[in-house]
Each structure stands twice: as structure tokens, then as C-alpha cells.
């Protein structure tokens, strides 16, 4: 009888701890600034989407395989507005992204080699977008969409052609609804 009582108490204690942890997480999210929410909740999901799109590809900057990040051509510190645009985020090795300050010269060369000069110029053009001024609720809504997109992409993770990778970036940028259409879609004329 005592053993059954102890098991019951343990289950109740575990449930209370779990509920408390969930409440703490919700409170922490509520107290986050809008930019902190973008950086810690939404940005990792967007970066993972870019990595899934580029699945099977080597680092855009140094051509290596291994531990990968979603690296930004235009750094987030330099321009927050382009931080969530998938055309600005490509698979990049951890080493190139972190220890070589983004490796921007080789990143540029890699974009041109993979997708062409017109695409690179489009990525540069993204910097002309006006500031986003998204609210935290906007970011929460975008996070929900991005999470669903990420899950669907994971179900069909395979190597894609350069054209398919650009098309996916076009489609997903539009689905997320963050940017004006001309900043979402690249089409070679």
C-alpha cells in the first residue's frame, strides 16, 4: 500500500514540476523583447528551414561538409530586416560562419557560382527593404507558420537542384508573409 502511495505521489510531483516548467517557459516568452523573441525563437526555425532546403549541399562559402548553420550573406547585425528572408540564408559550415566572420567574400563567390550573378544581385537588393516593424504577436504567428513548414520539409528531406532551392525559397517567403512580394521571389529574366 505504501509503495502504491509513493508511486502516486511521485506521479503528482512530476506532473506539478512539468506544469511549473511550462508556466515558467510561457512567462519567459511573454517577458522577452520583440527582437529577443525573433533571435531566440523564430530565427533558429527559419535558419533550419534554409538548411533543409539546402540539404546535401556543401557550405556556400568554403565548399566543405560537416556541422552546418544557416548563414546569412547580409549579417543580422548589419541589417535586421533581411534576417528572416530565406534568400539571404544558405547552408554554411559552422567554422565559416563563426570563426571567419561569415566569410563574406567566399560566400558571395559561392552564391554566384551556384545560382548566378543575377541571383547574387537579387540578394544584395534585399537590403533595400524598409524596416519590418513586426510586433511580437506578428512574430508568434510567423513562428507557427514556420514550424509547420519546417515539419513538412523534414518529411521530404532530399537533395534539390539549384532551381528547386530558389523556388522553395520563393514559395516559403510568400507563405510566411513577412516581406513584400518583390523581396520574396527571384525570377531570372
Features from the language model and the residues they span:
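Short, well-structured hydrophobic secondary-structure segments
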Residues: 41, 45-62
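Conserved aromatic-histidine-acidic binding/catalytic patches
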Residues: 38, 42, 81, 99
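Catalytic cores of secreted/periplasmic lytic hydrolases that degrade extracellular macromolecules
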Residues: 123
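Histidine-centered nuclease catalytic patch
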Residues: 51, 60-91, 100
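Short Cys/His-centered divalent metal-binding micro-motifs
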Residues: 66, 88-119
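Non-catalytic accessory segments of DNA primases and related replication-initiation nucleases
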Residues: 101-105, 126-128, 133
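A boundary/linker detector
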Residues: 1-45, 131-189
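Cys/His/Pro-rich metal-binding microdomains
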Residues: 1, 60, 94
Amino acid at each position: 500500500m505504501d509503495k502504491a502511495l509513493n508511486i502516486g505521489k511521485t506521479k503528482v510531483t512530476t506532473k506539478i514540476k512539468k506544469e511549473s516548467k511550462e508556466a515558467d517557459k510561457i512567462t519567459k516568452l511573454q517577458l522577452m523583447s520583440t527582437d529577443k523573441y525573433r533571435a531566440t525563437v523564430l530565427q533558429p526555425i527559419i535558419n533550419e528551414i534554409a538548411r533543409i532546403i539546402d540539404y546535401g549541399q556543401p557550405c556556400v562559402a568554403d565548399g566543405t561538409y560537416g556541422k552546418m548553420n544557416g548563414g546569412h550573406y547580409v549579417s543580422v547585425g548589419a541589417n535586421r530586416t533581411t534576417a528572416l528572408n530565406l534568400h539571404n540564408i544558405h547552408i554554411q559550415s559552422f567554422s565559416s560562419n563563426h570563426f571567419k566572420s561569415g566569410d563574406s567574400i567566399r560566400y558571395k563567390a559561392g552564391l554566384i557560382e551556384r545560382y548566378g550573378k543575377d541571383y547574387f544581385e537579387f540578394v544584395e537588393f534585399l537590403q533595400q527593404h524598409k524596416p519590418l516593424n513586426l510586433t511580437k504577436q506578428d512574430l508568434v504567428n510567423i513562428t507557427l507558420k514556420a514550424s509547420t513548414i519546417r515539419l513538412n520539409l523534414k518529411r521530404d528531406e532530399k537533395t534539390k537542384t539549384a532551381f528547386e532551392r530558389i523556388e522553395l525559397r520563393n514559395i516559403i517567403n510568400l507563405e510566411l508573409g513577412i516581406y513584400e512580394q518583390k523581396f520574396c521571389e527571384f525570377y531570372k529574366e
